[in-house]
């Protein structure tokens, strides 16, 4: 079993999730799902942004262009296959595919805002085609636990702010409706 280098005293930072929220709004503005992600690197007492992006599933026409996968691929291309000193922030709970990628990359920690339950409940309540996502309801925590690396998960981080993304619509004023 490999050692994860994120210290046990690690606390997620609001500013990084807020950047993921900004990226989610940009994704929505260009016609995609309002999902954003940021990957940071810990170096001593510092934590710096290495990558940030918004989802591209709709605009790319590829069902696997999840923002978590895309940011992990980008960071791996410059920092190597394993990322034990990196933290993934996502506005939405990573799906089973993205959580699996976190295991394979040996990410140091995962922080997310809204849960799969939040996402599913919103889709059922609003019943629009846009929110009838195909979902494999296997929790991120379950996948990470099965990976055997003891990757820390910080769930429901800035959850209320991330839930507002469900209502976010592209507009000239970028307001919530």
Task: Specify the residue positions occupied by each region the protein language model found.
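Short loop/turn motifs at secondary-structure junctions and domain boundaries
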Residues: 28-32
């Amino acid at each position: 079993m490999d050692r994860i280098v994120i210290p046990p005293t690690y606390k997620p930072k609001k500013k990084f999730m807020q950047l993921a929220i900004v990226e989610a709004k940009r994704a929505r503005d260009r016609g995609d799902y309002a999902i954003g992600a940021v990957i940071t690197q810990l170096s001593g007492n510092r934590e710096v942004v290495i990558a940030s992006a918004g989802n591209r599933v709709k605009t790319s026409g590829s069902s696997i262009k999840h923002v978590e996968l895309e940011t992990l691929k980008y960071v791996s291309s410059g920092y190597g296959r394993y990322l034990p000193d990196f933290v993934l922030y996502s506005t939405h709970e990573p799906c089973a595919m993205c959580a699996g990628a976190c295991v394979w990359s040996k990410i140091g920690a995962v922080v997310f805002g809204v849960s799969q339950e939040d996402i599913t409940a919103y889709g059922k309540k609003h019943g629009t085609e846009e929110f009838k996502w195909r979902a494999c309801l296997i929790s991120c925590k379950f996948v990470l636990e099965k990976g055997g690396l003891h990757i820390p998960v910080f769930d429901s981080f800035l959850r209320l702010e991330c839930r507002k993304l469900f209502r976010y619509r592209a507009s000239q004023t970028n307001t919530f409706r």
